[in-house]
Curated annotation (Swiss-Prot):
Protein name: Cytochrome c'
Lineage of the species this protein comes from: Bacteria, Pseudomonadati, Pseudomonadota, Alphaproteobacteria, Rhodospirillales
Pfam family, one: Cytochrom_C_2
Any single Gene Ontology cellular-component annotation: periplasmic space
Post-translational modification comment from the UniProt entry: Binds 1 heme c group covalently per subunit.
Keywords, comma-separated and alphabetical: Electron transport, Heme, Iron, Metal-binding, Transport
Function: Cytochrome c' is the most widely occurring bacterial c-type cytochrome. Cytochromes c' are high-spin proteins and the heme has no sixth ligand. Their exact function is not known.
GO biological process: electron transport chain
InterPro entries, alphabetized: Cyt_c/b562, Cyt_c_II, Cyt_c_prime, Cyt_c_prime_subgr
The organism's place on the tree of life at top rank: Bacteria
Native source organism of the sequence: Magnetospirillum fulvum (Rhodospirillum fulvum)
Residues that hold heme c according to the record: Q13, Q17, E69, T70, C118, C121, H122
One term of GO molecular function: electron transfer activity
Amino acid sequence: QQSKPEELLKLRQGLMQTLKSQWAPIAGFAAGKADLPADAAQRAENMVLVAKLAPIGWAKGTEALPNSETKAEAFGAKSAQFMEGWKAMAAESTKLAAAAKAGPDALKAQAAATGKVCKACHEEFKQD
């Protein structure tokens, strides 16, 4: 049985909250606003899992729902680009996990690259 768009939207919102909760401490560290999270590598590995699961929540029809926070016209026209963005997020998060194990300087450098992937997708597809 296929999931209803409303169920997928809830899944998506939960996954995005999870991604944010894992990313925020790393981003704070990279920006010099927080200490290095002791569990930075695990957080980055969690981000990989979320990035691989997240596309499930963006099934066709979910972009037009109230509270979707998605630019429906951009999503509809560029859904392949959107899915490629998730692949890029998984790849950058994998690099982030390796960088976290390599040390603080490597983590900061890779966090900048990971953040660019987040920002590019948000600018293209997320409603203000």
